[in-house]
C-alpha cells in the first residue's frame, strides 16, 4: 500500500511530496514474502555490484566502512511531487552512502539536484546513483513536470 513519503523517518510533509512502499518492512514483507525475497535478492545484487565499483574508485584510503543496507523503499512521484533539500543522515540514523535506483525515464522533471541545482546527473532507467549521505551532500528531487517517476532507495551503514 502506498503511504506518504517521509524524510529521515520524520513525517514532514512540506519537505517531501511523494508516496512510498516500504519493501523491507512489516506487512509488505509478510504479505508478499516469496516475491519480496526474489526482489530483495536482485536489488541486493545490483546495489552490491555497483557499490564494489564505487568503493574501488572512491575509497582508496579505506575511509568508507560499510556493513549493511537499511532495506528498500519504492518511491512514486506523480506530477508536482518533489523532495526539498535535505541530507540523508542524522544524529540518530547513521548512514554512510545513499543509493537511488531509477526504474523509469518516461517522465519530465524529477531530477536529483546537488549543489543548489549546479549538479543534476542525467539518469536513465536502470541507473544507480550512489553518493555520500553526509552533510556535505545536501540534495533534492525537483518537481515532476509530467508523468510518474519511480525509484527504489536504500542507505548503506
Feature locations, PLM:
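Eukaryotic intrinsically disordered and solvent-exposed regulatory patches
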Residues: 59, 86-87, 137-139
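A structural signal for short, well-ordered beta-strand segments
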Residues: 72-74, 99-101, 152-154
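Non-heme Fe(II)/2-oxoglutarate
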Residues: 1-64
Amino acid at each position: 500500500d502506498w503511504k506518504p513519503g517521509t524524510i529521515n523517518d520524520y513525517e514532514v510533509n512540506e519537505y517531501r511530496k511523494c508516496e512510498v512502499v516500504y519493501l523491507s518492512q512489516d506487512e509488505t514483507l509478510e504479505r508478499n514474502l516469496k516475491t519480496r525475497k526474489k526482489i530483495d535478492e536482485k536489488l541486493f545484487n545490483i546495489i552490491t555490484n555497483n557499490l564494489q565499483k564505487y568503493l574501488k574508485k572512491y575509497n582508496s584510503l579505506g575511509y568508507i566502512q560499510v556493513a549493511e543496507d537499511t532495506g528498500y523503499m519504492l518511491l512514486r512521484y506523480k506530477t508536482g511531487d518533489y523532495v526539498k533539500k535535505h541530507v540523508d543522515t542524522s544524529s540518530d540514523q547513521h548512514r554512510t552512502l545513499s543509493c537511488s535506483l531509477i526504474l523509469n525515464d518516461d517522465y519530465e522533471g524529477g531530477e536529483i539536484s546537488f549543489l543548489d541545482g549546479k549538479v543534476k546527473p542525467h539518469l536513465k532507467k536502470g541507473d544507480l546513483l550512489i553518493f555520500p549521505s553526509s552533510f556535505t551532500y545536501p540534495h533534492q528531487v525537483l518537481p515532476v513536470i509530467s508523468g510518474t517517476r519511480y525509484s527504489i532507495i536504500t542507505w548503506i551503514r
